[in-house]
Amino acid sequence: MSNESIKAEQDLIQEGVESEVSTEEASLIDELTQANFRIEELEQLLADALAKVEEQKDSVIRAAAEVDNIRRRAAMDVEKANKFALEKFANELLPVLDNMERALQGTNPQDETTKAIYEGVELTQKSFLTAVAKFGVKPIDPQGQAFNPDQHQAIGMQPSAEYPANTVMLVMQKGYELNSRLLRPAMVMVSQGGPSQEINIEA
């Protein structure tokens, strides 16, 4: 075999090897490119999934806060309902208390014929007030106190040397409150005369 034919054969082998290598290289580059695309795709999917998780987490936190708010509001509503459920019933009892008050005012405790009636009505009134106080009903008797438009209703004003101006000089009808909430204002006569009484409002 001549040198030229050996050389030609070697060139042919070389070309085949180079062709094979370049085909393999192209195939590897193609696979690598596809793998890179797939990685980018997966990274995008992961980023989307993480964003959805954050969004869902945010929704869950908001929903939990809303549930807490609803629970708190419901508890407050139940507490208010329990506290003031007696309001209508208590309002119906006020005329009974007023009648007992009038019976005491119209009866002379010194008179032997009416003394027993007076004591009976007084005892009944005390028992009745004790019973309703257990449920938060308390009388408002502002005799001699400064006039308070939040708790008192002025029937009229009269000059008075005995009471300072804007002072309750006469209670026509007691007021009542239920758990510190006004049921009925006290009906009062307010003084016009004398020195003005200082109203001390503590903050």
From Swiss-Prot:
Quote the cellular component terms of the Gene Ontology held in the record: cytosol
**InterPro entries to which the protein is assigned, alphabetical:** GrpE, GrpE_coiled_coil, GrpE_head
PROSITE patterns on file? GRPE
SUPFAM superfamilies from the entry?
Answer: Coiled-coil domain of nucleotide exchange factor GrpE, Head domain of nucleotide exchange factor GrpE
Q: Which residues cross the membrane?
A: none
The protein's matches in CDD domains, at most eight in alphabetical order, are given as: GrpE (cd00446)
Compositional bias per record (Basic and acidic residues), positions renumbered to this chain: 1-10
| Signal peptide residue numbers | none
The annotated region (Disordered) lies at 1-20
Swiss-Prot/TrEMBL GO biological process terms:
protein folding
Query: Which keywords does this Swiss-Prot/TrEMBL entry list?
Result: Chaperone, Cytoplasm, Stress response
State what this protein does.
Participates actively in the response to hyperosmotic and heat shock by preventing the aggregation of stress-denatured proteins, in association with DnaK and GrpE. It is the nucleotide exchange factor for DnaK and may function as a thermosensor. Unfolded proteins bind initially to DnaJ; upon interaction with the DnaJ-bound protein, DnaK hydrolyzes its bound ATP, resulting in the formation of a stable complex. GrpE releases ADP from DnaK; ATP binding to DnaK triggers the release of the substrate protein, thus completing the reaction cycle.
How is the subunit organization of this protein annotated in UniProt? Homodimer.
Record protein name field: Protein GrpE
Species, as recorded = Shewanella sp. (strain MR-7)
Q: What is the lineage of its organism?
A: Bacteria, Pseudomonadati, Pseudomonadota, Gammaproteobacteria, Alteromonadales
